[in-house]
Amino acid sequence: MKIWTSEHIFNHPWETVTQAAWRKYPNPMTPSIIGTDVVERRVVDGVLHTHRLVQSKWYFPKWTHALIGTAKTCFASERSTVDPERKQMVLKTNNLTFCRNISVDEVLYYEPHPSDASKTLLKQEATVTVFGVPLSHYMEDLLTSTISTNAGKGRQGLEWVIGLINTEVKGIARGTDELLHNTRRSIDEVTESARKSMDEISAQAAKAAKAMHIT
């Protein structure tokens, strides 16, 4: 059994990072993750519970095919909880494919940085166990190395999604500013038109009154 752990600090608040975590896949940094499907989602005592199925591609060396078999597509089960009051997001993932010989249990914790609330601390832990096949320790090292590499790509992917979200927010803000500007301009135009109409009516009334007085 191999245990891998890692910590990373995002220079973004917890709300932004967790929002990006839901939209993390697909992204160009982790093309091995094909997509996710929501199996179940419910809220219990203010905590969001979600069960998703993750579809991915794992590229094992050819020499492992005779030991564990082959699969073009791999599946994993992801169960998560999000507590907005305590600002905690926990994701637990375990593999479904190759589960007769391989067990990969991964846990991710997202929480505000203890000394800087404007940042988010990510803690990751993966437990890898290979059993029932030769060279199990070597395969555990191989899988652990792959997990470490993919974790780095995953963090890059999350930053990419955060950038996308920030761009969307700026676009919405810009659109709102344009809408307010156009609305103000329309109101000014209507006000000016009404003022001119009132001036014309007043002028015509004065002209008519003057004509009646002369007559």
Swiss-Prot record:
Its main location: mitochondrion. One of its GO terms (biological process) is larval locomotory behavior. It comes from the Eukaryota. InterPro entries: PRELI/MSF1_dom, Slowmo/Ups. Disruption phenotype: Flies have defects in locomotor behavior and die during larval development, due to abnormal neural function. Mutant males lacking functional slmo survive into adulthood and show an early division of the germline but never progress through the gonial divisions. Mutant females demonstrate germarial degeneration and reduced fertility. Keywords: Developmental protein, Differentiation, Mitochondrion, Oogenesis, Spermatogenesis. One of its GO terms (molecular function) is phosphatidic acid transfer activity. The keyword Mitochondrion applies. GO terms for cellular component: mitochondrial intermembrane space; mitochondrion. It is found in: Mitochondrion. Expressed in specific tissues such as the developing central nervous system (CNS) and both the male and female germline. In the CNS, it is restricted in a subset of cells during embryogenesis and early larval development. In embryos, it is also expressed in salivary glands. In the testis, expressed in somatic cyst cells throughout the distal region where the mitotic cysts develop, extending through to meiotic cysts. Residues 1-170 form the PRELI/MSF1 domain. It holds the Pfam family PRELI. Required to regulate peristaltic movement and also for germline proliferation in males and females. Belongs to the slowmo family. This is Protein slowmo. It comes from Drosophila melanogaster. The gene is slmo.
